[in-house]
Amino acid sequence: MIKKLENILFINTGGGICDALSSLALLNYINEIFSIDNLFYYSTDMDKFWFENKLSEFKPKNLITIKNFPQHFGFLYEHRKVSKNLINLFNFDKFDLIIDNQTRLKNSLIYKKIPHQQYISPCVNFLLSKPFILTKKNKNVTLRLINYFNRIIKKSFKPSYEIKIEDKFINTAKKIMSKNNKYIGFSITAGHPTRNKEFEIKEI
C-alpha cells in the first residue's frame, strides 16, 4: 500500500447530512494513517454539498467536495460510458486510491472504471478491491473499511467518533428541546427526495 497518497477519491453514496457526518470517523482515520494531499469527496447529496455549508466546521482541511460529477453518478447504467473520462475533470491521470464506501455491485463496477492505482470497496466482501485481502465484512459501516485498512498496513488503529459540537448548536437544541416541551422525533431511513414515502400520524 502506498504510504504517500497525493489524490484520494472517497465515494459516499449516502446523500443525507447524517451520512456525511457519519463518514467523518473514516475520513479522519485515513488522514491519520496516510499522508494525503487532496481528499476528494463525492456524495449523491442532490447538490447539498454538506461540508461546504452546514458541516463546514467539521470539514477536514484537505477535503475537496466534487460538484461536477453526473447527477446520481453510479446509479444509472449509462454512467459506465462516462466513468473513465471523469478523470479529465482533474489535473492528474489517475487517483492514487479510490475508497468506495458502499456495497452495490452495479455502482462499484461503474466507480472502478475511474482511472486509479488502488481501489478499496466492501462490495462482495472486498472482492473488487486492489489490494485484495480475504476477510469477512464487518456489519458496522465504518469499521468494515477501517478493519480492512488495518489488515493492509498491519496495525490496529481505532477510529475516533468524537465530534466537537459548537455551543451555538447546543444552545439551540436546549431551546427547542427544553424540559417543559414534549416532542416526537422521526428518523426515516432512505429518506432521499427521489423516494416517495407516506405515513399517517394517528393519535395514541
Where are these regions (language model features)?
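Catalytic machinery of carbohydrate-active enzymes
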Residues: 1-204
